[in-house]
Structures are given as C-alpha cells and as structure tokens.
Amino acid sequence: MAALAALAKKVWSARRLLVLLLVPLALLPILFALPPKEGRCLYVILLMAVYWCTEALPLSVTALLPIILFPFMGILPSSKVCPQYFLDTNFLFLSGLIMASAIEERNLHRRIALKVLMLVGVQPARLILGMMVTTSFLSMWLSNTASTAMMLPIASAILKSLFGQRDTRKDLPREGEDSTAAVRGNGLRTVPTEMQFLASSEGGHAEDVEAPLELPDDSKEEEHRRNIWKGFLISIPYSASIGGTATLTGTAPNLILLGQLKSFFPQCDVVNFGSWFIFAFPLMLLFLLVGWLWISFLYGGMSWRGWRKKNSKLQDVAEDKAKAVIQEEFQNLGPIKFAEQAVFILFCLFAILLFSRDPKFIPGWASLFAPGFVSDAVTGVAIVTILFFFPSQKPSLKWWFDFKAPNSETEPLLSWKKAQETVPWNIILLLGGGFAMAKGCEESGLSAWIGGQLHPLEHVPPLLAVLLITVVIAFFTEFASNTATIIIFLPVLAELAIRLHVHPLYLMIPGTVSCSYAFMLPVSTPPNSIAFSTGHLLVKDMVRTGLLMNLMGVLLLSLAMNTWAQAIFQLGTFPDWANTHAANVTALPPALTNNTVQTL
C-alpha cells in the first residue's frame, strides 16, 4: 500500500506532463474518423480544450498552439492565423485594460467605492447592497479580479469595525493564519494588480481546505454575526462576475462573441458597445437586485431579531465605528487631485463615445465618417493614447515665463512602464487563440460538419434550446475558464442556430453571458478564489449560495432574451447575414457532403 501511495503521489506531481504527452496520442483516432481537414481541425480544438481545462500549459501558451499546429497540419497558412491575434476586437479590449490601469494608478476606483459606501449607510443589508453595487460598477470597466481584490479589504475593515477583531479571529483557519488574513487591524492593505494575481495563480492552485469554524453553541448572536461576515465576502465576487457582463469590455467572453461573430458572419454589425449595454445593463440590475435579496436573506442581513433589539446601543456604537472607518479611509485619500479629475473625464469620454458611436436606435457619430471605417477599437485607442501624454499636474502658463521654475519633465497620467506592469497581456493572447480557433473551424469546414451532426436538434423549441444552453454552459464554466468555455461552445452555437433557423444571437448571447455565471466553486473564477482565500468561507457556503444564483441567472437571462433583447437585436427574424452563412454551409465540399448527408 505504501508503494502504491508513493506511486500515486508521483503520478499526481507529474500530472501536467502526463496530460501534455498522453492527450495528443489519445486523440489520434479523430484524424481517421472524420474527413481529413475537418478531422485535423477538430483534433487541434479538442487538444486545446483539454489543455485549457486541465491547465497542463498556461492558458495563454495554449492559445498560441494554432500558430504552430494549423500551418503544420494544413488547416490554415500562418499568414491567416497570426492576424487573428490582433483584430480590432483585441485592441478594444486592450484599450479597456489600459483605461482600467490608469484608474487604478490614480486610485480613482477606491475614491468611488468609499463614496458610495458613505452614501448607502452601514446597516448590514444596506452595506451588502452598497458593496454589490460598487463592485459591479467597477467590474463594468475594470477586470473582475481587480474589482474583487480592491473591495474585499474594504469590506473586511468595515466588518471588523462592526463586529470587532475577536469575531474575525475565530473564523480564520488555525493553519496558515498569517497567509489567509485579508486585512490587518482596521487598515486597508495594498491591492494587488490583476497581473500579480494571475502570475501567482499560474504556478499552482491553493488547497481548498475547509476549516471548521469554532462556534460557541450558546451564542446565536455570534452565529448571526459570522453569517453577516460570510454574506459580505460572498457578495463581492458574485457582483463582480455579474457586473462584468454589462459592458462589452467588462469581461473577455463578451469580446470573444464580438470577434467570432465577425468571423462566422462578416456582415453582422448589430453588436457593438452601445447595443450590448442597452441589453446587458438592465439584466445586470435585475440580477443584482435578486442576488442581493437572496444573499441578505440567506446570511441574515435583513434579520434584526435578537442582537438588534437586545444590543441596540452596542449596535449603534459598532455602526458609528464602521462609519468612522469609511470616512477615515476616504479622508486619507485627501482632496481630489488634478490627475484623478483628468482620468475621470477621460473615462467618461471613453464610455460616452463608445456608447454613442452606433447605438442603433438613433444614428451615432460614426455616421459622419465613411461606413465601416470607424469601429469601437478606434474610439478606445484614441482615448487611451491621451493618457500617455496628458500631464498629471495642472499645467500653468506662468511656468513658461518663470525662468527659475524647475524644468523637470511632467509625468503623464499613465506611464508605459506602469501599463506594462499592470495590464494582463496574456488575456490578449487568449482572445487571439479563440479567434484563430474560430477561423480554423470556418476555413476547414469543421463548422459545417458540426452543423450536420446537430440535425437531430432541429426540432427542439428555441426557448427550450436557450434554457438548455445556459444550464449546460453555466455548469461547464464552474470547472473551466469562462474564456476557454466560450471559445469552445460559440462555434457550436452558431451552427445550431443555423440548423434551428433562428437568429444566431438568440443562442450565442445567452451562451456568452452564462459563461460569467460561475458562482458555486472557489475554482470557478479568480474572484471566487480571492474571496475563498480569506479563510472565512467554506466550499459548502459557496455551493448552497451559488446554486440558486445560477438558477436565478439562467431564468433572468431567458427572460431578457425573450423580451427586450428581441427588440434590440431583432431576434424574431432570421437575418440576411445569417442566410449568407447558411448558403455557404449548404454548399459543402464533396467529402464533407457525403458524411453530412448520411446523418440527415
């Protein structure tokens, strides 16, 4: 038994290497089961899918495999693969990341967060709402990871003021206590950048240890306070995931949808920043509301019986302390600086120009230029370029006439060195890998072959198809990266829509949004992992809370797709640009036609 256990440990330690070597061999039969070109493309896609799900290679390195495998296997020439890594969609996302970097550099996000918390009050239910609203708003523009990493220390400091240091110590695991505590004292720690978080997490996964909470049997008040603490911590990563869906640049799957739409349906121009915001923002608000009600109900944020009535004076003192912590941290930021004002104005300009470029319901400012020349990427890059030369100190005409004034160069709002350090460049490669995969599916005929295999699903009602898609993808993304998940599923959804003869967006949008609805496990998303690493949450806490969150998300998404999304994207019709693609699918190569016809 000892030898067997030792062997198992060695196999586990070498699991990544074994996956790297054995999976390519295990997938070889696919090359002989399908038509040659389609089989080779499916081989590459399944290989990348396994590598992504197991993280045998870093996600961004796996995304580079099409550059190697597509040319070698005769699927696509290198001249067609490499440009997929720098489409205008990638530059739109890059501009959003750079804008987020400037906001973080000037601490504007912390000022916004503390100001909102000062406005909502410090009663538990209202504070949970304030945390969720603030986190979701920040996540619309910053990454989900950065928003969570910033808000958790603020939440912990407020909770320590409400309930005292004694309560938090009991909630921390005995082992590794120093490594899991999120906040020391009542001060707020330095927030790690997303680049630092991704770098630290790529080396391996933290052990998901469930530390038993030492709860006095005779203290219902203690239990209530601990539940409030859990409610605060669990609401932050959930609202970050929800908020990221509201804007096109909020999370990577949204932009992957845009890029793959342009690949599969080149004439499709209905999805842009403005139209997506009009669809997704109301959905985000609805989900936040029901999510807040559920979390507040489950963790006692709306219950005042017991400790509120018996200890009203004590509670008033605790709330005063919490207010003092928020106000002190806000005052520590000092008066608003010129650099903060400049970044805020550029951020507002960034959002307004993206929204108004082509909002669909009225002509946008892009109509002033030649059709098709100005995209969202042009707007984004134009605004963020200003960040690198606009001065961070208020310019003065007196300086030009004061020859004794120092002649040091003015620091810009954002330096390129800082952008290099804080922008997660690996996500750009991950996006490119998804676009290259979509291009390979289209050029090889694999998309058409998949469409032929989906023929039995032609009689599934579209409403049921949407529900099934959201449930399956929401479940799948609990165990795999949301970016990898949507890269794998979108080509299938596009072909399924053609077979069902429904608007492609009717299936592709819910598939994309449901990728962000990963609430049940710590490993589902980086925000979940950050919250779990504080040591205050158990896996069962996330499962019981996240299960209903997933269900509510699926139902609300189905509601949105069958109500206001119908008007925004004209989902009730089968568009001409999809008809063109359907005609291309029908005109299959001879080898592919034989295989497809046999399945019909």
Swiss-Prot record:
Residues 38-55, 104-137, 251-278, 358-372, 483-505, 568-600 are extracellular. Li(+) decreases succinate transport in the presence of Na(+). Its main location: membrane. GO terms for molecular function: alpha-ketoglutarate transmembrane transporter activity; citrate transmembrane transporter activity; dicarboxylic acid transmembrane transporter activity; glutathione transmembrane transporter activity; high-affinity sodium:dicarboxylate symporter activity; L-aspartate transmembrane transporter activity; organic acid:sodium symporter activity; sodium:dicarboxylate symporter activity. CDD domains: SLC13_permease. PANTHER family: NA(+)_DICARBOXYLATE COTRANSPORTER 3, SOLUTE CARRIER FAMILY 13 MEMBER. This is Na(+)/dicarboxylate cotransporter 3. The gene is Slc13a3.
